[in-house]
């Protein structure tokens, strides 16, 4: 399910570089993480929903690429972000 505008605003306020920041890797990764968590909860109840499972795998791959980009370009921002999001790496 897509994020509501209120959810996006709260995520961007917490993780973005400024209040209208949607392009920074931190903001994109935070929004993808929220969508991944939502889809994961959905799949716990709907185990046979393979279309959503494929969408989840695509989102995880997109987030992995953004995390790799951030780790290659700025390790300090990368470490700070994974600590704030609670991701394991």
UniProtKB/Swiss-Prot annotation:
Keywords: Ribonucleoprotein, Ribosomal protein, RNA-binding, rRNA-binding
One biological process term in Gene Ontology: translation
UniProt GO MF annotations: rRNA binding; structural constituent of ribosome
Cited PROSITE patterns: RIBOSOMAL_S15
GO cellular component: cytosolic small ribosomal subunit
InterPro entries per record: Ribosomal_uS15, Ribosomal_uS15_bac-type, uS15_NS1_RNA-bd_sf
Domain of life: Bacteria
Purpose: One of the primary rRNA binding proteins, it binds directly to 16S rRNA where it helps nucleate assembly of the platform of the 30S subunit by binding and bridging several RNA helices of the 16S rRNA. Forms an intersubunit bridge (bridge B4) with the 23S rRNA of the 50S subunit in the ribosome.
Family statement: Belongs to the universal ribosomal protein uS15 family.
Assembly description: Part of the 30S ribosomal subunit. Forms a bridge to the 50S subunit in the 70S ribosome, contacting the 23S rRNA.
PANTHER family registered for this protein in UniProt: RIBOSOMAL PROTEIN S15, BACTERIAL AND ORGANELLAR, SMALL RIBOSOMAL SUBUNIT PROTEIN US15M
Protein name: Small ribosomal subunit protein uS15
The organism of origin for this protein: Corynebacterium efficiens (strain DSM 44549 / YS-314 / AJ 12310 / JCM 11189 / NBRC 100395)
Lineage, broadest ranks: Bacteria, Bacillati, Actinomycetota, Actinomycetes, Mycobacteriales
């Amino acid at each position: 399910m897509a994020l509501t505008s209120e959810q996006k605003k709260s995520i961007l306020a917490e993780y973005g570089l400024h209040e209208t920041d949607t392009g920074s890797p931190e903001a994109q990764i935070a929004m993808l993480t929220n969508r991944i968590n939502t889809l994961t909860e959905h799949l716990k109840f709907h185990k046979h929903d393979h279309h959503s499972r494929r969408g989840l795998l695509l989102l995880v791959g997109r987030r992995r690429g953004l995390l790799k980009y951030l780790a290659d370009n700025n390790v300090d921002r990368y470490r700070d972000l994974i600590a704030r999001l609670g991701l394991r790496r």
